[in-house]
């Protein structure tokens, strides 16, 4: 078999007159009565191959048997297309290949999905036949971008003198965070490894070990409920460094991300990125990962509401809640009563009891709650919300967390429906000064907002024992267009501070020693100050490639039920394998 001389998408007019050897898949076959045209495809693109009896009867006879997705080896001569046959939409649209020989390397059945960017196959069918789905150019281009992003990050970190170090996949199960995936040990009866949710502890131990600068393209595993932007196994760019301040870490990540954007996406973004404190993000956007590509910020009306004539508002404030509103500029005529009812049902998903609304008209406020506001109150409301005729005002009165969640989500929905979002923008943002702990009323205990190894502000360390809810974290999240790209922090590196953190989280001294004794002991041997960040590679590629689902950025992903439709994993295992592990199954009976 002769060697391939050209990739299909790279045969240009410079090759006219040359004999070329091409290999690829049949994208399309057209029989035009005596002539057969084939679009031959490989990962670089498509080239048109012509089978003409005057050039080769033998090649034409073979071409008559060829169907879509056959794998071919074609030998032929490159010629310029006639003036009326030029296709400027193709890189190879000014030439075609006159076939002299063709060899079918492999035949193909009719494929269950159309191999084209605009395939109409359902996602389940695409995942079952993932190897066919991956043939689509849009999929290849996504993974080419993933490769380019990873390569750029590796090159950047190499110039910054970071070492790429692999950490264990089989490790110890520890509390906090999501559920672990467990792996039974054959050698140690009744004991289990856990697959890592992140390399957090190991990268800190590498800092104890004096490596100073570490990174890893790390596989991580979390047994959690899945969403469109979650997978049970995912990849993160894991970075840790000693002796750097928070500002130094943020500056380095900004330089890295601007290079990624330029090299992998061809987009210039400016640094430094804006910074916003967590409390401000929640107050202004109702989100800890705000999409800043459009306005429509939340406005706190609690002070006004406390003295207004609308009891729903006043009672919410009196009970310790708040009233906030968003002004959808010019949207009054775009939302009917039925549309607003749909918005009301939408905010109820986030815990809101309802959605109050007003439309601003030339002669004043109109809507079901307008009667509760006199002229003075109406003017204050209009002034505070900067409302003018044609605006739609939307209010939620509830607990602070419900107001933030519901209006934050409503803001995003309105931004999309009103086409306020410039999809060409890439708005990076740092969210800083997070709360260190969050209280869970159901569990009646505190949980770490990020993880238990996050350093509090020095002046807040003592609050861990007196008022844990007031302690602030030296933590930072990188946000892009309303998605959390990653999170990081400065780390605790002193045993006494780490023990105070564990105590605030409800760990007894014995539990802390059992779970994290190795880390606590390491802190007694001269641990340097250190910090880092972990960036979600899958999510970053999803945003840069313009995809809407993480599954499109992972070669062989899982479904929302954490199953693989291609291999049918997870699946039962043989009884002999269970016996070897000294395991017995005790399955719940289906109700």
From Swiss-Prot:
It is an enzyme of class 6 (ligase). Pfam families: GAD, tRNA-synt_2, tRNA_anti-codon. The record marks 84 as: Important for tRNA non-discrimination. It catalyses: tRNA(Asx) + L-aspartate + ATP = L-aspartyl-tRNA(Asx) + AMP + diphosphate. It comes from the Bacteria. Residues 200-203 are annotated as: Aspartate. Belongs to the class-II aminoacyl-tRNA synthetase family. Type 1 subfamily. Homodimer. This is Aspartate--tRNA(Asp/Asn) ligase. It comes from Bacillus cereus (strain B4264). The lineage of its organism: Bacteria, Bacillati, Bacillota, Bacilli, Bacillales.
């Amino acid at each position: 078999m002769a060697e391939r001389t050209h990739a299909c998408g790279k045969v240009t007019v410079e090759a006219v007159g040359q004999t070329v050897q091409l290999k690829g898949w049949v994208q399309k076959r057209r029989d035009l009565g005596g002539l057969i045209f084939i679009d031959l495809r490989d990962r670089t693109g498509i080239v048109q191959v012509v089978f003409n009896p005057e050039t080769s009867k033998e090649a034409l006879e073979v071409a008559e048997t060829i169907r879509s997705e056959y794998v071919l080896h074609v030998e032929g001569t490159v010629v310029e297309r006639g003036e009326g046959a030029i296709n400027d939409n193709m890189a190879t649209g000014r030439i075609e290949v006159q076939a002299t020989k063709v060899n079918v390397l492999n035949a193909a059945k009719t494929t269950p999905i159309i191999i084209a960017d605009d395939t109409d196959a359902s996602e389940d069918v695409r995942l079952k036949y993932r190897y066919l789905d991956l043939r689509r150019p849009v999929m290849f281009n996504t993974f080419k971008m993933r490769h380019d992003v990873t390569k750029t990050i590796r090159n950047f970190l190499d110039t910054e003198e970071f070492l790429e170090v692999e950490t264990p996949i089989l490790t110890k199960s520890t509390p906090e965070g999501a559920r672990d995936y467990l792996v039974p040990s054959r050698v140690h009866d009744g004991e289990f490894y856990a697959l890592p949710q992140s390399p957090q502890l190991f990268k800190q131990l590498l800092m104890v070990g004096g490596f100073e600068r570490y990174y890893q393209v790390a596989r991580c595993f979390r047994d959690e409920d899945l969403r469109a932007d979650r997978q049970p196994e995912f990849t993160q760019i894991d970075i840790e460094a000693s002796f750097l301040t928070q500002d130094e870490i943020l500056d380095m990540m900004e330089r890295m991300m601007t290079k990624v954007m330029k090299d992998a996406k061809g987009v210039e973004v400016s640094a430094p990125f804006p910074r916003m404190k967590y409390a401000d993000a929640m107050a202004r956007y109702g989100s800890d990962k705000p999409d800043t590509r459009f306005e429509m910020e939340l406005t706190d009306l609690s002070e006004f509401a406390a003295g207004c004539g609308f009891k729903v508002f006043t009672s919410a404030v009196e009970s310790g809640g708040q009233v906030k509103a968003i002004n959808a500029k010019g949207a009054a005529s775009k939302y009917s009563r039925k549309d607003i009812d749909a918005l009301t049902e939408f905010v109820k998903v986030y815990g809101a009891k309802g959605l109050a609304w007003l439309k601003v008209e030339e002669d004043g406020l109109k809507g079901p709650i307008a009667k509760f506001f006199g002229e003075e109150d109406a003017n204050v409301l209009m002034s505070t919300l900067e409302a003018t005729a044609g605006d739609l005002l939307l209010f939620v009165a509830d607990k602070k967390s419900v107001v933030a969640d519901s209006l934050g989500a409503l803001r995003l929905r309105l931004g999309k429906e009103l086409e306020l979002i410039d999809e060409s923008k890439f708005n990076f943002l740092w969210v800083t000064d997070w709360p260190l702990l969050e209280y869970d009323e159901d569990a009646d205990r505190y949980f770490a907002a990020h993880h238990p190894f996050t350093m509090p502000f020095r002046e807040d360390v003592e609050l861990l024992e007196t008022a844990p809810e007031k302690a602030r974290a030296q933590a930072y999240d990188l946000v892009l267009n309303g998605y959390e790209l990653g999170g990081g922090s400065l780390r605790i590196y002193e045993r006494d501070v780490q023990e105070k953190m564990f105590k605030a989280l409800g760990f007894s001294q014995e539990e802390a020693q059992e779970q994290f004794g190795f880390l606590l002991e390491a802190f007694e041997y001269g641990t340097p100050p250190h910090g880092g960040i972990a960036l979600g590679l899958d999510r970053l590629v999803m945003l840069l490639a313009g995809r809407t689902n993480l599954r499109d950025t992972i070669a062989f992903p899982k479904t929302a039920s954490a199953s693989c439709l291609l291999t049918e994993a997870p699946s039962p295992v043989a009884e002999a394998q269970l016996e070897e592990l000294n395991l017995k199954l005790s399955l719940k009976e289906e109700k």
